Swiss-Prot record:
<keyword id="KW-0479">Metal-binding</keyword>
<protein>
    <recommendedName>
        <fullName>3-dehydroquinate synthase</fullName>
        <ecNumber>4.2.3.4</ecNumber>
    </recommendedName>
</protein>
<dbReference type="Pfam" id="PF01761">
    <property type="entry name" value="DHQ_synthase"/>
</dbReference>
<keyword id="KW-0520">NAD</keyword>
<dbReference type="InterPro" id="IPR016037">
    <property type="entry name" value="DHQ_synth_AroB"/>
</dbReference>
<comment type="similarity">
    <text>Belongs to the sugar phosphate cyclases superfamily. Dehydroquinate synthase family.</text>
</comment>
<dbReference type="InterPro" id="IPR030963">
    <property type="entry name" value="DHQ_synth_fam"/>
</dbReference>
<feature type="binding site">
    <location>
        <begin position="168"/>
        <end position="171"/>
    </location>
    <ligand>
        <name>NAD(+)</name>
    </ligand>
</feature>
<dbReference type="GO" id="GO:0009423">
    <property type="term" value="P:chorismate biosynthetic process"/>
</dbReference>
<feature type="binding site">
    <location>
        <position position="263"/>
    </location>
    <ligand>
        <name>Zn(2+)</name>
    </ligand>
</feature>
<feature type="binding site">
    <location>
        <begin position="128"/>
        <end position="129"/>
    </location>
    <ligand>
        <name>NAD(+)</name>
    </ligand>
</feature>
<feature type="binding site">
    <location>
        <begin position="70"/>
        <end position="75"/>
    </location>
    <ligand>
        <name>NAD(+)</name>
    </ligand>
</feature>
<keyword id="KW-0862">Zinc</keyword>
<keyword id="KW-0547">Nucleotide-binding</keyword>
<dbReference type="GO" id="GO:0009073">
    <property type="term" value="P:aromatic amino acid family biosynthetic process"/>
</dbReference>
<dbReference type="GO" id="GO:0003856">
    <property type="term" value="F:3-dehydroquinate synthase activity"/>
</dbReference>
<comment type="pathway">
    <text>Metabolic intermediate biosynthesis; chorismate biosynthesis; chorismate from D-erythrose 4-phosphate and phosphoenolpyruvate: step 2/7.</text>
</comment>
Length: 358
């Protein structure tokens, strides 16, 4: 079992990565003893893992569950209220703990519910998708979507522990696994050139779910994110680099309707647009764009935006992006493999050229 620490002073917490961790009561015991436990999961994950985690936690306290519909389109205030209603109807107090058992949608909603309920109760992340294991479960970003924008209603709220059981990936649909790889590849582009090269060399091992390769890839992503979050918890500086591909990607998700494009698929296409923007600005050359595209394609990810999206569609959503400051769209762009920066002087004419030529 691999352990990584997210250093945030009194809000520090561990990430555990390994196999069969959902049956490891010893690791969870210190976070659950004498607490009432409410597990939040969805209709897809519940038949696979809910009974197992309930049995693991039953010796520590009273365990109940809430099962939500599965999909990004249900990450909204209405379904957040379902969690609040369960907590209130069953008289959960401040000594309770919420457990997020699922992917990024469940993790984001459960964390936001924990941040809000009685002004804050403990929560635990048990991510079951690759995307949530390498990205959304770490760092304390919690939110729900609004019809006008993704993750617009939320809070920074850190979990007590992140428990990553890599065996969950064996029940993950291939499309979901590929979507997670978009976030994995992002770390190589924006932070670690050696990791990017390792990914290029280990495509087959990862696609065949080689245990050693999975643990290494997930661990390296979590190490990078833990490092970044420890430096900049609330995204005032370096943490913004983790949004590589996301400004374009969030526009795709919002325009196409949440759930039609998976988050990772939109990030993949958005990462290519970011790379093409960087090339248009003279920050990188064509060879780097090609390496990025080839690696994304190796994992069966989309490398272009939907044909139905034009420049006006993109710019409307990008102007609402959370990184906008003083009315200026700010983009995270690669400056090399392994490096990225935030740029606020990208003109709309440059963006139009990139989007129209993509």
């Amino acid at each position: 079992m691999k352990q990584i620490q997210v250093d945030l002073g009194v809000r520090s917490y561990p990430i555990y990565i390994g196999q069969n961790l959902m049956s490891d009561g010893e690791t969870l015991s210190r976070y659950l003893l004498k607490k009432r436990i409410l597990i939040v999961t969805n209709e897809t994950v519940a038949p696979l893992y809910l009974k197992q985690i309930q049995e693991t936690m039953a010796s520590f306290g009273e365990v109940e569950s809430v099962i939500l519909p599965d999909g990004e389109q249900f990450k909204d205030l209405a379904h957040l209220d379902t969690i609040f209603t369960a907590l209130l109807q069953q008289n959960y107090g401040r000594d309770s703990v919420l457990v997020a058992l699922g992917g990024g949608v469940i993790g984001d909603m459960t964390g936001f519910a924990a941040a809000c309920y009685q002004r804050g109760i403990d929560f635990i992340q048990i991510p079951t998708t690759l995307l949530s294991q390498v990205d959304s479960s770490v760092g304390g970003k919690t939110a729900v979507n609004h019809p006008l924008g993704k993750n617009m209603i939320g809070a920074f709220y850190q979990p007590q522990i992140v428990l990553i059981d890599t065996l969950c990936l064996h029940t993950l649909p291939a499309r979901e696994f590929a979507a997670g790889m978009a976030e994995v590849i992002k770390y190589g582009i924006m932070w670690d050139a050696d990791f990017f090269q390792w990914l290029e060399d280990n495509v087959t091992a990862l696609k065949t779910l080689d245990a050693q390769a999975l643990v290494y890839a997930i661990s390296r992503c979590c190490e990078i994110k833990a490092d970044v979050v420890s430096q900049d918890e609330t995204e005032q500086g370096v943490r913004a680099l983790l949004n590589l591909g996301h400004t374009f990607g969030h526009a795709i998700e919002a325009e196409m309707g949440y759930g039609n494009w998976l988050h990772g698929e939109a990030v993949s296409a958005g990462t290519v647009l970011a790379a093409q923007t960087a090339k248009a600005l003279g920050l990188i050359d064509e060879s780097i764009v090609c390496r990025i595209i080839q690696l994304l394609q190796a994992f069966d990810l989309p490398v272009s935006a939907p044909e139905s999206m034009d420049f006006d569609s993109f710019i409307q959503h990008m102007r609402r992006d959370k990184k906008v400051l003083g009315g200026q769209i700010r983009l995270v762009l690669p400056t090399a493999i392994g490096r990225a920066d935030v740029f606020s002087q990208v003109t709309e004419s440059t963006l139009e050229q990139v989007i129209r030529c993509a």
